[in-house]
UniProtKB/Swiss-Prot annotation:
Heme c binds at C55, C58, H59, M205. It comes from Rhodobacter capsulatus. Keywords: Cell membrane, Electron transport, Heme, Iron, Membrane, Metal-binding, Respiratory chain, Signal, Transmembrane, Transmembrane helix, Transport. GO terms for molecular function: electron transfer activity; heme binding; metal ion binding. InterPro entries: Cyt_c-like_dom (IPR009056), Cyt_c-like_dom_sf (IPR036909), Cyt_c1 (IPR002326). It holds the Pfam family Cytochrom_C1. Binds 1 heme c group covalently per subunit. The chain crosses the membrane at residues 249-267. PROSITE patterns: CYTC. The main subunits of complex b-c1 are: cytochrome b, cytochrome c1 and the Rieske protein. This is Cytochrome c1. SUPFAM superfamilies: Cytochrome c. The gene is petC.
Amino acid sequence: MKKLLISAVSALVLGSGAALANSNVQDHAFSFEGIFGKFDQAQLRRGFQVYSEVCSTCHGMKFVPIRTLSDDGGPQLDPTFVREYAAGLDTIIDKDSGEERDRKETDMFPTRVGDGMGPDLSVMAKARAGFSGPAGSGMNQLFKGIGGPEYIYRYVTGFPEENPACAPEGIDGYYYNEVFQVGGVPDTCKDAAGIKTTHGSWAQMPPALFDDLVTYEDGTPATVDQMGQDVASFLMWAAEPKLVARKQMGLVAVVMLGLLSVMLYLTNKRLWAPYKRQKA
């Protein structure tokens, strides 16, 4: 018992330290969070627009089939539009013929490789930790999941207009981001022990979002904050397209198990209670 208690405390402490790596990521309420949460179709469509017009230049989604854009629970775009959209993307080498052809809706989104290209965004929402809970305890991840959408949202909106006071000139060719933890930091922004004194660090990626960068088809004002929320939601759907269906299945399973437990209890009372009283 003592060893178990020590192990549990150690895990909590170590987990807290890891969670503190992204302690500057603040909580944000998305529509798909919680047991009954669902994706907002309008938001997914706006997020897809931001991805296709802004992010897709440098970031691919090589694990996401294009056809899923018309699936239930997602953006549910018109299949004809999806086919035309696929045909307008980068061409692909056919696996059977070895010849170059137009991309089809059954193919994956293009990938982006080479100098200046960013990481693939297919599962980015599951690969980054967001809000860690009180004091970086990691409780938020335990009860609400890893929080990747929060990280994405805070990252794309986390480029301040001015650099921190400790390095007003910044780093040439890099851009300060308030939640990015693994980038470069000037010596002027470190204490005597060499630990950085800023919340974030400098990243190679420049700010990608600006007010009115896109024109939303539904008329929603395209502020940086709005575009950040929308693209984060879209990337969460891209990483977890069956999230809502899985929640519903889990809820049904819990209800069925609850009913089964009640039935077993009542059956036990009905069949065995008289014999237990006789034995007593």
